Regions:
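Signal peptide processing junction and immediate N-terminal pro/mature segment
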Residues: 33-44
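Compositionally biased, long intrinsically disordered regions
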Residues: 46-80, 86
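Extended alpha-helical scaffolding segments
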Residues: 311-352
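C-terminal non-catalytic interaction modules
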Residues: 323, 361-376
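Charge-biased low-complexity segments
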Residues: 370-485
Length: 485
C-alpha cells in the first residue's frame, strides 16, 4: 500500500499520528494567564492584570481521536473569531505548564497542530484565508512568539502543498519554485521570532521543518537538534523530526534513522530512553512500504510503549500505532491484543484507509490465537533451557539431529542458520515441530522429522519430563564441523 502522506513528501506541519486526549467531558482550557516572566505574548498582557483564558467546554465522548479533533476545532474557532489575546494567553499557559494529554502528547504541540492543520483537500483559497488570519494575529500582537510560529508553520505546510505528494521527478518547475519561496518565508518569520523576548519549544520544531524543506546538510541539521534539545530536553518531537530527516528519501541512508533512534535512546538511558525509542519509532512506522522501520527493535518498542501507557495513560490513537507496529513485525498476538482494545476506532492518520485497518484487524483475529499459543510454547522452551540439566539435554538433542542435517545438507546447498521448535515425547520421539524461518534446510528437516515420527522412531534421549519443548537454533555449518571431528 502506498503511503499517501509520508512516503514521498511529508507535510511537516502535520502530526502523522494523533495522540491521546481525555475521554470524559472536560473543560478544554480555563486557566489564569501567566505573568511576563513565564512567557509574555503581547505588550498589553505584560502591562495589565492577568485575566483568565476561557474556551468552550468540549465533550470528548469516549473517543480520544474525536476529542483531539474537537480540541483543534475549538482553537480554530478562536482564530476565525480573531480572539488573538485569548490564543496568546492559552499558549503562554501551555508553554509554562508543560502539560500533556493522556498518551504523552504535549498540549502545546497539539495547540499548534490544531491551528495550522487544514483538513481534507485544502484549496489555494483555503490556505490564503488561513494565512491572512495568522498575519492579522501577528500584526495585532507583534510581540507574540506564538503568532509568528503559527504563521511560519502555515507557510511550511503551504510549501509542501505546492510540491505535492508525488516523487521528486514529477514535481513541476512551478512547484519547486513555490516550495522554495514559501520555505524561505517561513524561515524569515522564525528568524524574526527568535529576537522576541518570549521563547517557545515549537520554534525549534518549526525550524526543523524548514531544514527538511530547504535541504540543510546533516551537520547544520544536527546543530539545530542540539540547540533544540538543550532548550527543552523533553520535547520529543525534535528527535522524531530529525529521524524523519534522516530517512533515505531525504538526507540519510538505509539504517540512519533507526541508528539515530537507538543512539538517542541509549544516550538518555533507562526507562526514559526506552520511552523515547517508541516515540521515535511512532514517527517512522507507516502503512506503506518503508523498510527502515523494520530495523527497529520490536521488543524495545513494546517496552517503550508499556512505559508510556503506565506514565501517561491509555490512548486509542497510541494503540493504533502499536497495532500497526505489530503488523509490520508480524507479531499477530500483539496485534490482536491491540486491535481488541481499539475496537472500531480506526485512526486514519496511522492506517491511511479504514479498509486497510479492517483487513489487518481480521488477519490479526485469525492469527492471534495461534500466535499466542506459539509464544507460550517458546516461553516454555526458554524455561526448560534454564532448568537444571536443560542446557545439557538441549545439546544432546542437537547432536541427535546431526544425521538429519547431514542428510538434508547432501540434497541442497542451503547453509543459512534457522530455528526449529520441537516437542519431545516421553519415549524420545518427536511429537510436534515447526520452523520459524522457511529456509530450504528447515523445510527438509521438518520432512525428515515427520518421516521419523511416521516410522515411530525415537531419535532423542528421554526428556526430563513429559511433552518437553525445545527452541533449537541450528547451523548447517555444524554438519561439516561434526564430520571433521
Amino acid at each position: 500500500m502506498a503511503c499517501l502522506s509520508e512516503g514521498v513528501s511529508p507535510s511537516p506541519i502535520s502530526r502523522i499520528h494523533r495522540m491521546a486526549t481525555g475521554l470524559a467531558s472536560v473543560i478544554l482550557l480555563l486557566a489564569t494567564a501567566h505573568a511576563a516572566a513565564s512567557g509574555p505574548s503581547s505588550t498589553s498582557q505584560e502591562k495589565s492584570t492577568p485575566k483568565p483564558c476561557v474556551a468552550p467546554e468540549i465533550d470528548f465522548g469516549g473517543n480520544d481521536l474525536q476529542g483531539l479533533d474537537a480540541y483543534g476545532a475549538a482553537l480554530e474557532d478562536l482564530l476565525k473569531a480573531e480572539k488573538f489575546k485569548e490564543l496568546n494567553c492559552i499558549a503562554d499557559l501551555q508553554r509554562s505548564g508543560k502539560e500533556r494529554f493522556p498518551g504523552g502528547m504535549w498540549k502545546l504541540h497539539e495547540y499548534y497542530w490544531g491551528i495550522t492543520k487544514l483538513h481534507g483537500h485544502p484549496t489555494h483559497e483555503d490556505w490564503e484565508d488561513r494565512l491572512k488570519l495568522a498575519q492579522r494575529w501577528v500584526d495585532a500582537t507583534p510581540e507574540s512568539i506564538t503568532a509568528r510560529v503559527v504563521l511560519a508553520e502555515l507557510y511550511t505546510g503551504y510549501a509542501w502543498d505546492a510540491r505535492g505528494n508525488d516523487t521528486s521527478d514529477s514535481v513541476t518547475d512551478s512547484g519547486w519554485k513555490l516550495l522554495s519561496q514559501r520555505m524561505e518565508k517561513a524561515k524569515t518569520l522564525l528568524d524574526q521570532a527568535s529576537a522576541l523576548p518570549a521563547k517557545c519549544p515549537e520554534w525549534y520544531f518549526a525550524m526543523q521543518q524548514v531544514a527538511l524543506g530547504q535541504g540543510w546538510d546533516v551537520a547544520r541539521a544536527e546543530e539545530l537538534l542540539k540547540r533544540a534539545v538543550a532548550f527543552e530536553p523533553d520535547y520529543y518531537y525534535y528527535y522524531r523530526q530529525h529521524a524523519f530527516y534522516l530517512m533515505p528519501q531525504w538526507n540519510g541512508e538505509d539504517g540512519d534513522a533507526s541508528r539515530f533512534a537507538l543512539q538517542s535512546a541509549d544516550r538518555i538511558g533507562g526507562e526514559a530512553g526506552d520511552l523515547l525509542y517508541f516515540q521515535i519509532g511512532a514517527k517512522i512506522v507507516c502503512a506503506c512500504d518503508r523498510p527502515e522501520f523494520t530495523r527497529f527493535s520490536w521488543p524495545r518498542l513494546q517496552k517503550g510503549y508499556a512505559l508510556l501507557e503506565k506514565k501517561y495513560g491509555v490512548s486509542v490513537a497510541q494503540l493504533n500505532l502499536v497495532a500497526s507496529m505489530a503488523v509490520k513485525f508480524q507479531d499477530w498476538a500483539a496485534a490482536d491484543n491491540a486491535f481488541q482494545r481499539i475496537g472500531d476506532n480506526c485512526d486514519k492518520g496511522t492506517w491511511m484507509t479504514e479498509t486497510y485497518f479492517n483487513q489487518m484487524k481480521e488477519v490479526a483475529t485469525q492469527m492471534g490465537a495461534q500466535a499466542a499459543r506459539s509464544n507460550a510454547i517458546l516461553q516454555e522452551a526458554a524455561t526448560n533451557l534454564q532448568s537444571a540439566g536443560g542446557a545439557q539435554y538441549q545439546k544432546s538433542v542437537e547432536q541427535a539431529l546431526l544425521p538429519f542435517m547431514r542428510q538434508c545438507a547432501s540434497s541442497n546447498n542451503d547453509r543459512v542458520q534457522f530455528e526449529l521448535v520441537v516437542k519431545v515425547g516421553k519415549d524420545g520421539g518427536a511429537e510436534d515441530a515447526w520452523f520459524r524461518q522457511p529456509t530450504a534446510m528447515a523445510q527438509c528437516m521438518m520432512r525428515a522429522i515427520y518421516d521419523s515420527r511416521v516410522k515411530k522412531e525415537t531419535p532423542f534421549p528421554v526428556p526430563p519430563r513429559l511433552d518437553y519443548w525445545l527452541d533449537l537454533h541450528l547451523d548447517p555449518a555444524s554438519v561439516s564441523v561434526a564430520a571433521a571431528n
